[in-house]
Regions:
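Cysteine-centered catalytic environments shared across enzyme families
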Residues: 1-245, 257, 376, 381
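Short Ser/Thr-interspersed hydrophobic loop/turn segments at strand-loop and sheet-helix junctions
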Residues: 24-35, 101, 115, 264, ...
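Conserved glycosyltransferase catalytic-site signature
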Residues: 76-77, 96-98, 253-258, 278, ...
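Short hydrophobic "helix-edge" motifs at membrane interfaces and signal-peptide entry regions
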Residues: 107-108, 196-198, 264-265, 329, ...
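Adenosyl-5′-phosphate
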Residues: 140, 155, 253, 270-272, ...
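Conserved acidic
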Residues: 174-182, 248, 252, 256, ...
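ATP-dependent adenylate-handling ligase core
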Residues: 226-261, 265-268, 286-295, 334, ...
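Short acidic/histidine-rich active-site segments
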Residues: 268-278, 282-284
Length: 419
């Protein structure tokens, strides 16, 4: 299992087996580069496998030290294990980070995943096992984001519980105050995500999201997808991309993220990106009222549209965003990189979900609060039409009559057969 996933954790690996249960872990070294014996992490009683980063590990370490805990490494993984020992499952509410981890105490296994699903986790009920990628575990299902679970070795029963709940009330604050608060939160999120003992960079498209991130930190390394005719390379490497994705995709973006990660791999081990901004702050064109809604609102002022914006965004957060996170994680992992997303800081997620909808979308205007924030930080910034990392797959394969999702899926099947 570890060998199949070695690409995402190339620096170290190890296995602990007590005869009842075995746990293995690979490591991509980001913090505390010199400490040995961190795969898996153990204190002699608890054993932990862990994928991710706890961004507020320094603050938690200080709190745990005051509670009497001693540390032998500078790693966030040791902080996480001691946080679990101190607070049990309640430690999850103290974590600011992306994570999927499992802790074994000789009798049961505790598993948990971050609230947005940034880090992957899959499990199999029959002959219980878990892994970070589907390819390592036949017959597995996805562990839900924002949940924890306890597997009892004696009974063979797994209990799942939600540990994170979205805010249910809309806050009453002015747009000006909201912009100020987001400014502070985003600054903190970026600073925490640049805590690393290795070089790091930024996926930079020039759009609002990545440009905002760049205003809070001076990034020596920036990576932008270059639009070229990649037809031959696309056809050659796409089977590899599908292998790392584990599943077919209707998105054209994986090749773009593959190229970005390939370039970033030459210089850094960590990249920041703008995932989550569109889903949380209303960045998609489909949020803009269509002509039917526009006419209906003119004639019937009380008409609010067929689909409430808030419900649409929540569906995006739980649907499209998870797909994009899977793509970003797998393409970065394929090149031994770690992808970090400041907009998916827990504080920003909860802030965004509690914002009045008119601070995100109003009429035909999208991402209102982000546009106000970038005006504040970069007064001369020219807001451009959203592009992202656009990959022209339909043009490369010579389709004159359009290239739909069905054609794309058929192409993937053909490429996999040839590889």
């Amino acid at each position: 299992m570890l060998d199949v996933m070695k690409h995402r954790a190339p620096d170290d690996s190890g296995i602990i087996d007590d005869g009842k249960f075995a746990m293995g872990m690979g490591r991509l070294k980001i913090l505390d580069l010199d400490s040995p014996n961190l795969c898996p992490v153990t204190d002699g009683e608890l054993v932990m496998t862990y994928n991710g980063e706890i961004y507020n590990y320094l603050e938690l370490r200080e709190e745990l030290t005051q509670l009497g805990h001693e540390f032998s490494t500078e790693s966030d993984s040791e902080v996480l294990l001691k946080a679990y020992r101190q607070w049990g499952d309640l430690c999850l509410d103290r974590l600011n980070g992306m994570f999927a981890f499992a802790i074994y105490d000789g009798h049961q296994i505790f598993l948990a995943r971050d609230l947005a699903g940034e880090k992957p986790l899959y499990y199999r009920k029959r002959a219980f096992a878990f892994a970070s990628e589907r390819k390592a575990l036949e017959g597995c299902i996805e562990f839900p984001p924002g949940h924890y679970g306890t597997y009892d070795l004696q009974t063979g029963h797994l209990t799942l519980k939600r540990w994170w709940f979205p805010p249910t009330k809309i806050r009453g604050l002015s747009l000006e105050d909201a912009v100020k608060e987001l400014d502070v939160l985003l600054n903190s999120a970026v600073q925490m995500r640049t805590r690393a003992h290795v070089p790091y960079g930024l996926y930079f498209s020039g759009g609002i999201d990545s440009t905002l991130i760049s205003t809070y930190h001076s990034f020596e390394h920036r990576y932008t997808y270059q639009e070229k005719d990649y037809k031959e390379e696309f056809l050659k490497v796409f089977p590899k991309i599908l292998y790392h994705l584990d599943l077919p995709t209707t998105h054209f973006s994986p090749f773009g993220y593959w190229k970005l990660a390939e370039e970033a791999n030459k210089e850094v081990k960590v990249v920041l990106s703008g995932e989550g901004a569109d889903e949380l702050f209303g960045g998609y064109v489909r949020y803009v009222p269509n002509e039917f809604n526009r006419q209906a609102q003119q004639h019937f002022p009380s008409y609010k549209g067929i689909f409430p914006y808030t419900d649409m965004m929540w569906d995006e957060f739980n649907g499209n965003l998870r797909t994009l996170l899977r793509i970003g994680d797998r393409m970065a992992g394929a090149w031994g990189l770690e992808n970090r997303c400041p907009f998916l800081d827990r504080r920003i997620i909860e802030f965004a979900l509690a914002l009045p909808i008119e601070y995100k979308i109003k009429g035909f205007e999208t991402k209102i609060i982000l546009k106000e924030l970038i005006k504040k930080r970069l007064p001369n910034y020219e807001i451009k039409e959203k592009e992202g990392f656009y990959v022209k797959v339909n043009e490369w394969i010579g389709s004159k009559d359009g290239f739909g999702k069905t054609d794309y899926m058929r192409l993937q099947k053909q490429l996999c057969k040839k590889s």
